[in-house]
A protein has these predicted regions:
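Cytosolic regulatory and coupling regions of membrane transport/channel systems
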Residues: 1-44, 48, 52, 154-166, ...
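Pore- and pathway-forming membrane helices of multi-pass small-molecule/ion transporters and channels
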Residues: 7-17, 35-43, 47-73, 84-91, ...
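Hydrophobic alpha-helical transmembrane segments
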Residues: 25-34, 53-59, 107-117, 306-313, ...
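Interfacial helix-loop-helix linkers and transmembrane-helix boundary segments
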Residues: 73-81, 159-161, 186-189, 353-361
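Membrane-helix boundary elements
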Residues: 81-101, 356-374
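Hydrophobic alpha-helical transmembrane segments in multi-pass integral membrane proteins
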Residues: 93-98, 151-159, 374-378, 425, ...
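Transmembrane alpha-helix boundary signature
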Residues: 94-108, 131-132, 379
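Core alpha-helical transmembrane segments of integral membrane proteins
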Residues: 302-392
């Protein structure tokens, strides 16, 4: 009971706060400009050389630049090459599937293949982005490009043409994404820290909407630590690159400001409930964090029945399949559209209320987005006007993708419709069908969100608390014969398990406040013992623990186990 009084269970924000929340206050127009230029520049070359058909194909590869935004230049090429290769692959397979669907003599129900392909993409992408804990927009563009490319087969596009022009868009993205490194090689991490300081100051000085400002500050803090880690400035809770030490010091100062003001306002971790994409930041910590475990480790840890990533995948697949079957039965001709709509709502495995709000965002944003598409369609865009429309939508979607979901969808909706070659089809039937599929997918996804695997979060919480205990025991055993610096991987894994356990109990508190009470006291004890162990390692990195120190660590872990 004392633990619950000292660390109260987080309260769910109001629906109004969820509807109007801006998740990030960071400046995004430079990245948005690169995203627009990645379509505009190669598209202009295609038009000038007489290849008007290539504009949509270039767009599939031009999304590559989005995945590199915010990444330090040390890791950006690898991230962009991986994303670009994935985009081109799913687009090429989509065109092959489309040629089979639209072959002469094949009827309406052959579109089921498009739905199955899009569902398979959504399943794989949904699991990967949650297991790896990717930042927004996650893998959404992979699903959108893969599903939409099926519809490109309605034209005379060949796989060879797609590969060439998509690769052109990818190369343009790589050049645009890496060009700033010539003038400002440490720009991404410097801007991440500057954004953090701005968010921390706004949180401290703000007189209203403190919950939203705290969430923005936490989001900026996570982005800053991640940038410093990817830039190899910090490792193992310490500075390893003295040239970047001033950035670490500024980040720590901002973190202290955020934590102190959060304690003064007694907000706790309530701001985590403002979004379905929770940041891996403990609101009470003021130390340099460890880096993330390897991708293989994160995927392996998520590959269990009741994990957040696995349950999210189940919800995505179930809602997508039902949407596809019902949509085709009603005569709709874009099953990929229904899958993408369901995926957008469920892709992060949201809690019940935030997920429902995301569905409302999808509905409101899509209606406005369809109206925007109608205006573009009315004026008969093609060639240069089509290129400008694609680039403008890409620019605006990138501006809002990490800020507000409803506004982002306003621009991603016409972008997806244009890429699916809907500009050449009759307007009224297209609008009716797309709005019908959106409504259908949101209703089905909402039902699945609330009804499927309702007890899984409880089982997952119990499992994660066991994992945290096991990770503490593993690290403690290693410290008997090793220095903390020689067991960095075990320290890193323990931090990951503590953050995972904390993240899960936040979700459980939002959806099932009665069930969370049985885990809360042990949650507090586990977090205290785990960080006590990690702080010892950070304080004494290069020597083995004494017998007295080991006894103190053992007492902390035993107390957590008994809680």
């Amino acid at each position: 009971m004392a633990a619950q009084l000292d660390y109260p269970i987080p309260q769910r924000p109001s629906t109004t706060q969820l509807l109007t929340a801006f998740n990030s206050a960071s400046v995004r127009w430079p990245g948005a400009l690169r995203a627009g230029l990645a379509i505009l520049l190669p598209g202009a070359i295609a038009l000038l050389t007489g290849h008007d058909y290539a504009i949509l194909l270039i767009s599939t590869g031009a999304f590559t630049v989005i995945f590199g935004e915010g990444q330090p230049y040390r890791t950006r090429p690898r991230v962009m090459l991986t994303a670009g290769t994935a985009l081109i692959t799913v687009a090429a397979v989509g065109v092959l599937v489309g040629h089979l669907i639209f072959a002469p003599g094949h009827g309406h129900w052959w579109l089921l293949l498009a739905g199955l392909y899009s569902t398979a993409l959504a399943a794989g992408c949904g699991f990967a982005q949650n297991a790896l804990r990717l930042p927004p927009p996650g893998t959404f563009f992979l699903v959108m490009v893969g599903g939409g490319s099926v519809m490109l087969a309605r034209t005379d596009v060949t796989v060879g043409q797609l590969l060439f022009w998509a690769l052109t868009g990818m190369v343009a993205s790589l050049i645009l994404g890496m060009a700033p490194a010539l003038f400002d090689p440490h720009g991404p991490e410097r801007r991440a820290v500057a954004s953090l300081e701005k968010a921390a100051s706004a949180f401290q000085a703000g007189q209203d909407d403190s919950l939203a400002r705290h969430h923005q500050a936490q989001t900026a803090l996570f982005a800053a630590w991640q940038a410093l880690s990817d830039a190899h400035i910090i490792r193992g809770g310490r500075i390893i690159d003295s040239q970047g030490a001033h950035l670490v010091e500024r980040t720590l100062a901002a973190q202290h400001t955020i934590v102190a003001h959060n304690r003064a306002l007694d907000l706790g971790s309530d701001s985590d409930q403002l979004t379905d994409h929770v940041t891996d930041v403990d609101p009470n910590r003021t130390a340099i964090p460890h880096t993330r475990p390897t991708g293989r480790y994160r995927l392996y840890r998520a590959a269990v029945q009741d994990s957040h990533a696995m349950v999210t995948t189940q919800k995505v697949v179930l809602s997508a399949i039902i949407t596809v079957l019902v949509g085709l039965s009603l005569g709709f001709d874009r099953p990929d559209w229904g899958v993408v709509s369901a995926f957008l709502m469920l892709q992060w495995g949201p809690d019940h209320v935030p997920g429902t709000v995301r569905g409302i965002h999808r509905m409101l944003g899509s209606v406005v987005g369809v109206l925007l598409f109608s205006i573009l369609h009315y004026f008969g865009i093609n060639g240069w006007t089509l290129l400008l429309a694609l680039a403008a939508c890409q620019f605006c979607a990138e501006i809002f993708v990490a800020k507000n979901y409803a506004i982002c969808v306003i621009f991603s909706t016409p972008l997806a419709l244009l890429m699916g070659n809907s500009a050449t089809r009759p307007l009224l039937p297209t609008i009716q069908a797309r709005c019908g599929e959106i409504l259908l997918s949101i209703l089905i996804a909402t039902a699945v969100l609330w009804l499927w695997q309702r007890s899984a979060p409880v089982r997952n919480q119990a499992r994660l608390q066991v994992r945290a205990m096991e990770s503490m025991a593993t690290l403690l055993g290693l410290l008997f014969v090793n220095t903390p610096d020689s067991v960095l991987s075990a320290r890193r894994d323990l931090q990951y398990e503590l953050l995972s356990e904390r993240r899960a109990i936040q979700s459980l508190a939002a959806d099932n406040p009665d069930a969370v009470r049985q885990f809360w006291a042990r949650h507090i004890a586990l977090q205290h013992a785990g960080y006590f162990l990690l702080d010892f390692c950070t304080t004494h990195p290069d020597r083995t623990a004494t017998r007295e120190e080991l006894d103190a660590l053992v007492r902390e872990i035993r107390a957590a186990r008994a809680a």
